[in-house]
Structures are given as C-alpha cells and as structure tokens.
C-alpha cells in the first residue's frame, strides 16, 4: 500500500464532504484517512442483545430496542422545535427525539414498520426517551449484521446533533476499508510475532474495527497495545543510546582521598542497601566515557542528600567542580547548611549563591569559581546567570527538577566545554510504569528503603467535630517543646475563598493559642516573597511554635523539631500532596503525627485517599494508588502529556504489556543497536515513519 494514500484529507473519503470534514476535524481531530483509521472504538456492543422497553434502566448506556414508530409530532420549545416519535414494542412505549434534521427524518421514516433503535436513554416525567437514535429497519439490520460485536466510537454531542452518529462513523470506516483494498505492512519482526504469538497487523486492524468474535477482538487489542508501547519504549531507549554514544562525558576514573576519607571515617550513619546500590550505579556512570543522565528517586527522608554529596566528592577527587541547584532559596540554604556540616572534616570549599547574595560576596564567588578554588556551589536558578562561570564543572545536580523549565536546565549543559554529568533528584515518587514511559530515556535509580530506626509517622483521620480534642493534642505537644504545622488547601479556582478559610483558621487558632505563651507564624501565597521567607525562617529557628500556612510549604524544608502536621480539609488534597506534606514532619528523633481533618461528607475517591494515607507511609505504594485515581496525564501534568497521549494502551491497566514491550525493545537493541539485521527491517522502517510524522500512530500502516 502507498503510505501517502493514508495522508489523504478526510473530505475526499466518499460520504464525508466539506461540512462533515469540518466537524470531524474540530470534534475528533480527524484530518486524514490515517486519523480515521486510528479512531479506535471505546467499547463494543453485543448486537445480538435487545432490550424490552419495560426492562430499560434510567440513564442507561447504549441499548438496542426493537419496536414500531406509531406516531410523529413536532413540539415547540424555547429555541426552535423538536421532532418526537412514539416508539412501541409489545410491552411498552418510549419516545425517540430529534432536535434538528426534522424534514429529512419525517420524509424517510415509515410509520408502523419495525425498526431497531440504538442509543442512550433518558428518563423524564415517567417516560423513557432516546435522543438522536441510530435507526435501521429490522430487515436491513439483520441482513447487514456480519458480527455480533458493534464498535462504539468516541463521539461528542455536537457530532450526534449534526447527524454524525455511531452508525455513520461505522459506515465511513467500511468505506475506508473498501478503498484501502491491500493489506497493511507488518511493523514488528517475525521473531516477536512468533514468540508472543501476536496477531498479524492486517488482521489486527480489521478486527479492531470489524471483530469476528470476542476471542479475535481480544487478540487484536493485545497486538495493537503491545505495538504502541513497544515503539514508545524503542524511541526512549534509542534516545538514551544516541545520547550515550554522541555526548561524551568526563571519565571519573579515580575514587580518591575525599571520597574514601568521608566514606570510611566521617559518614554520620551507616548507608542503607539501597543507598549503596545507587552509589554504585552512579560510580559506574561517572567512570564511563558517556555523560551521565540519571534520575534519582527517593521518598522523603530516604537519604538522597548523602548520595548527592558522595557523587560530588567523586567529581572533586578527579579535579572537577560540582554544583547543586534547588528551586527555592530556603531549600538552597538548607542544602548548604547540611552539606557544609558534613564537609567540615574535609578540605573542601563550598559556597551558596541565591538572588539575595550580596554583590561583594557574589564577586568573590565568581572569582573563586573561575580559578577553581571553589569546589561546590549550591544555589537557586542564580547559578544559571551568564556571569557564573566554572573552571571545570564536572557534575550538576538538580533537586526537584520538575520545578525548572527545559531551557533553564539546558543552561547548565553549557557551563563547560563538554556537558557535565547530570543527576536529577526528586522526592516525588513516580510509579515504575509511569517512570518507564515518561523518563524512559534517563537511567533511573531508586532509593526504596528508609534508614533503620526512623519512627513511622502516625497518621490519623479526624472529623471537624473532633477539633477540640485535636487542639488539646497540639497544646500537649507544644508543652513538650515540639512545633506544629497547620495547613489549609489552596485551589486556584476559589483562591478568595481559600484565603478566607486560612484567615478564619488563623483567627480561631490565635484565640485558642494566645500570646505570649504561643507564637504563631502565617504563610500564604498573597504575601511578598521576603515576608514569606521571614516567617518561614522564624519557624525554622524555633521562634514560633505553630505555622499556619497554605500549601506553600516547600518540599524539602527541614525542621527536625516539627513533629505534628495538621491538614485541614484533607479531602481537597491529592494523594501526592498529602504525602509530601506529611513528609515535613518526622525529621527528628521524636514520634511524629499527621492529622487529616475533614467534614463528614466525603466522596468515594476522598475516602480512598484518606484510607491510603492512614494505611501506608510507602511513597511508591501511594503513587500507584494516585495513578489509578487520577490517571497518568493528570498526575504528570501537561508538560508530559504528549508522551502519555496513548491511542489504545492504558499505562494503569496495561502495566504487564508495558513491561513485556520494554523488555523486547531492550533485547532488540542489545542484539542489533542500529537495527540493521534483515529480521528487524520492519521495525527499522516503522521507526523511520515515526521520525517522519512525529507521531507514534502515523506509522500504523
């Protein structure tokens, strides 16, 4: 088949024309024959099943009813008119309704003939109705029926109201297959097809739109899901291979004095098995000739900072400098304080550069950075300024990288003749399947165990009616010298309301915890950055016992004495947010607590979130539940939505297929990195089509 044929504009398909083409483009994004072919059904209806009118349920999904049209009438309404048909079977009566196209419908309907009506039903004033049904004479319906399974395609209200019903879309699909004539080019290798017993491409495409039976349909769906996920994984793995072959890195071959001295004599605690494994992975990367491009995932408190420091010591022992970039000044200061303390026994020079660094100190930093006297620089995006020049930057560590734009991150690459090694750290657990799909081009390390002896944070759910008991608990904790966070939600759509909630809460807390015995900080989004910083620092220094805040409490803020986190209206937070907020406590030796406050009125999803939070403290387990509740697009945000814009596979439901697809993509490239073997010619050709059309599904044929 000529692949260009499928790029034919959709208006040239028989039965479409310019008006329908405009609607298909606007409503479903169908511009070409290819796009229509890739409009996969949402589900399938068993066309051998018919309902009696008396057995219909309110607001049912698509159903089929056999009956006769006995009467037609036009009814006036506020805007225009509607056409109503009385539709009867042996046991009951319902209405068929059209809001447009009355003249054509009236002329073509035959009273007292037997029809099959197909569509969604509504129930109003004691009567069932079906708006804009698909209607077909029973005798025609029976003669046409090739398969018991009728595909139900994605649609919109505008399409249905304009007469582009499911039957019309099915008809267009039939017409397209008539014009295609020839079979589809195979996209997978014979070996993969044989080993996994996958259905051939031509048969899979035919069965997805015109299923022979349930068994063949299941095979077709599996085949196409595997194909989609296989080529996504292949793309990501090739990107990684190309990166490693083209972008050379400085080989750090020496494990020298600083690393050995710190590791053997000055480690403040024994490393966990996970930390040791991750350090080994990083050492292997740094020792190769390729630039490291690694994502380090670790739950709150898992010990990423010590791994970051050991990585920087390897760079320093090899005569290079290192930097660590954090998204906020407070986090930068905390990293600086922690790393300075750890580096005291070593002869290492370390500085911090942020937006508030004085000009005179800035000049000193710039100078010592350029002449190589400064070993480690920590800071905010101030590190990206053109004036910041390193003598030989060998390792750049980015904390919470999702807070930085791509352009900002790429600036670090150009701080040296060759790009430095890159280590990206995140405390936001990403489910394994999602990480494979979104960050599949990075090497991924996971610290999946917490240091021994760390006490689990006790998490409880309390209703608003128990508030006085919660206040009593807070008083008991502050009397013991502990500090407390009280956090309110901030949802942009109701920012004014949320601000009022926060201020009302602050007022009632101030009454309950009066001065001078209690000192309270308040932080919210409407404050100036300097004021916010001032209040946060008062709490960090222990000058206030209670911090009342919206969700602006930064990831990574470390106040070891804070042992209680109260989250107000917890049902309004996502699981990831709840877990991150809980991670603000439990940093010290004392037992910590997280109290989730809610009203009694809770949705099913909210109950699941609260049960998950009280049931586990494992960030990866929580992330898996979050993925199931929210879906991948919402979880990762719009920035990654392109990677996750899947046509037929579902990352949440098809994890087993994703793992198999990645395994086969990896095996294929290990044996044939350039895809030059004859057995991989189909894969190579398909991969070339992906590059040409920049779309996973534009290679389908």
Predicted feature descriptions by range:
Residues 75-266, 671:
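Upstream accessory/linker segments immediately N-terminal to the RecA-like ATPase cores of bacterial MutS
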């Amino acid at each position: 088949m000529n692949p260009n044929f499928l790029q034919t504009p959709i208006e040239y398909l028989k039965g479409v024309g310019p008006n329908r083409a405009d609607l298909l483009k606007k409503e479903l994004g169908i511009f070409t024959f290819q796009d229509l072919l890739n409009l996969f059904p949402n589900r399938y209806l068993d066309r051998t099943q018919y309902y009696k009118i008396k057995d219909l349920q309110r607001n049912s999904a698509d159903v089929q009813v056999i009956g006769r049209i006995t009467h037609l009438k036009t009814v006036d309404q506020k805007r225009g008119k509607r056409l109503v048909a009385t539709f009867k079977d042996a046991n009951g009566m319902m209405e068929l309704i059209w809001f447009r196209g009355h003249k054509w419908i009236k002329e073509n309907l035959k009273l007292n003939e037997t029809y099959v009506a197909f569509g969604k039903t509504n129930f109003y004033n004691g009567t069932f109705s079906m708006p804009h049904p698909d209607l077909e004479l029973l005798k025609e319906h029976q003669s046409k029926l090739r398969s018991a399974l009728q595909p139900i395609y994605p649609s919109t209200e505008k399409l249905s109201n304009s007469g582009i019903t499911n039957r019309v879309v099915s008809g267009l699909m039939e017409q397209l297959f008539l014009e295609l004539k020839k079979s589809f080019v195979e996209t997978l290798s014979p070996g993969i097809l044989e080993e996994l017993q996958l259905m051939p491409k031509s048969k899979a495409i035919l069965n997805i739109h015109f299923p022979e039976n349930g068994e063949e349909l299941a095979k077709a769906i599996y085949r196409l899901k595997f194909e989609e996920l296989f080529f996504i994984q292949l793309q990501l793995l090739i990107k990684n291979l190309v990166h490693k072959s083209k972008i050379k890195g400085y080989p750090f071959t020496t494990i020298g004095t600083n690393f050995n001295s710190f590791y053997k004599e000055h480690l403040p605690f024994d490393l966990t098995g996970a930390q040791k494994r991750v350090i080994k992975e990083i050492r292997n990367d740094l020792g190769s000739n390729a630039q490291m491009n690694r994502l380090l995932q670790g739950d709150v408190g898992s010990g990423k900072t010590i791994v970051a420091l050991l990585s920087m010591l390897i760079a320093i022992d090899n005569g290079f400098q290192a930097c660590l970039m954090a998204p906020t000044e407070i986090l930068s200061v905390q990293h600086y304080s922690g790393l300075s303390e750890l580096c005291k026994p070593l002869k290492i020079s370390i500085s911090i550069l942020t937006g508030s660094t004085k000009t005179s100190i800035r000049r000193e930093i710039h100078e010592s950075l350029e002449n190589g006297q400064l070993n480690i620089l920590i800071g905010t995006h101030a590190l990206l300024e053109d004036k910041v020049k390193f003598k030989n930057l060998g390792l750049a560590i980015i904390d919470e990288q999702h807070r930085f734009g791509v352009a900002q991150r790429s600036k670090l690459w150009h701080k040296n003749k060759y790009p430095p090694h890159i280590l990206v750290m995140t405390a936001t657990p990403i489910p394994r399947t999602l990480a494979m799909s979104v960050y599949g081009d990075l090497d991924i390390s996971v610290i999946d165990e917490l240091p021994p002896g760390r006490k689990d944070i006790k998490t409880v759910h309390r209703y608003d009616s128990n508030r006085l008991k919660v206040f009593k608990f807070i008083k008991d904790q502050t009397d013991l010298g502990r500090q407390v966070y009280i956090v309110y939600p901030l949802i942009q759509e109701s920012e004014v309301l949320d601000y009022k909630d926060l201020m009302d809460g602050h007022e009632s807390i101030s009454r309950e915890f009066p001065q001078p015995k209690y000192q309270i900080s308040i932080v919210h989004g409407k404050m100036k950055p300097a004021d916010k910083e001032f209040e946060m620092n008062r709490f960090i220094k222990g000058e206030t016992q209670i911090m009342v805040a919206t969700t602006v409490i930064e990831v990574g803020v470390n106040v070891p004495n804070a042992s209680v986190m109260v989250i107000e209206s917890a049902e309004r937070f996502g699981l990831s947010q709840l877990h991150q907020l809980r991670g603000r406590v439990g940093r010290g030796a004392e037992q910590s607590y997280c109290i989730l406050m809610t009203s009694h009125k809770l949705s099913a999803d909210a109950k699941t979130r609260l049960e998950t939070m009280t049931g586990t403290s494992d960030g990866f387990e929580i992330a898996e539940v979050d993925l199931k509740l929210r879906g991948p697009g919402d979880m990762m945000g719009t920035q990654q939505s392109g990677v996750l814009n899947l046509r037929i596979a579902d990352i949440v439901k098809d994890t087993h297929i994703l793992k198999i697809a990645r395994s086969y993509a990896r095996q294929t490239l290990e044996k044939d990195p350039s895809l030059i073997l004859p057995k991989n010619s189909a894969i190579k050709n398909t991969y070339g089509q992906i590059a040409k059309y920049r779309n996973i599904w534009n290679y389908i044929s």
